[in-house]
């Protein structure tokens, strides 16, 4: 969790909250009602400005869920032919270590000897609007990018890249999904890194 930790280490106020909560209930499923889930979701949606939120256990699980949501939208709303949906990703990405996610990694150590790999992903140069536009076709469901890449250093795209990608997605009826596990929650001076570009992703 080296890149996902957003709350520091052993802050006294957080330790107390964690301890107090564990005395009440340590873990439960969304399948069961608790009196804290509603207020939690209300807080998250108010902070983020999105209408909905889905709590997950990890960044990789969140990305996997975003992939599933994008594919379902592509088949049900965009009417892409079944099992043909594609998602555009960037070279040098890091979204997690599940079997699906490593399938679109460009890092050999992350994917070698773990095949066969999951199809349905097209990788383009990070920061290139032209590459994104050229990769889009009738089967493109979504783009999935990090606003700032964190696997090989702190790699920022050109200033105009996210606004360009937003425009390209709007023009082609493609979802824009941003993974902010490493760049979100105030790490860049704003709640989400995409806010510096004055755009809003779909998820």
Predicted regions: what they are:
Residues 1-203:
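Conserved N-terminal phosphate-binding loop of PLP-dependent enzymes in the Aspartate aminotransferase
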């Amino acid at each position: 969790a080296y890149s996902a930790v957003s709350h520091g280490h052993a802050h006294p106020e957080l330790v107390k909250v964690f301890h107090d909560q564990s005395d009440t209930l340590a873990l439960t499923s969304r399948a069961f009602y608790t009196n804290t889930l509603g207020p939690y979701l209300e807080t998250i949606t108010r902070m983020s400005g999105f209408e909905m939120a889905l709590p997950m256990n990890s960044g990789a699980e969140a990305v996997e869920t975003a992939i599933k949501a994008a594919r379902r939208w592509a088949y049900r709303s965009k009417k892409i032919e079944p099992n043909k949906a594609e998602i555009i990703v960037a070279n040098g990405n890091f979204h997690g270590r599940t079997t699906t996610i490593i399938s679109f990694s460009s890092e050999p150590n992350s994917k070698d000897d773990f095949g066969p790999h999951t199809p349905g992903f097209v990788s383009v140069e990070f920061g290139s609007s032209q590459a994104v536009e050229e990769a889009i076709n009738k089967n493109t469901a979504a783009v999935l990018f990090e606003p700032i890449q964190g696997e090989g250093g702190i790699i920022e795209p050109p200033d105009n890249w996210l606004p360009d990608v937003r425009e390209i997605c709007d023009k082609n009826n493609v979802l824009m999904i941003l993974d902010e596990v490493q760049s979100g929650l105030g790490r860049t001076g704003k709640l989400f890194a995409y806010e510096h570009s004055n755009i809003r992703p779909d998820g």
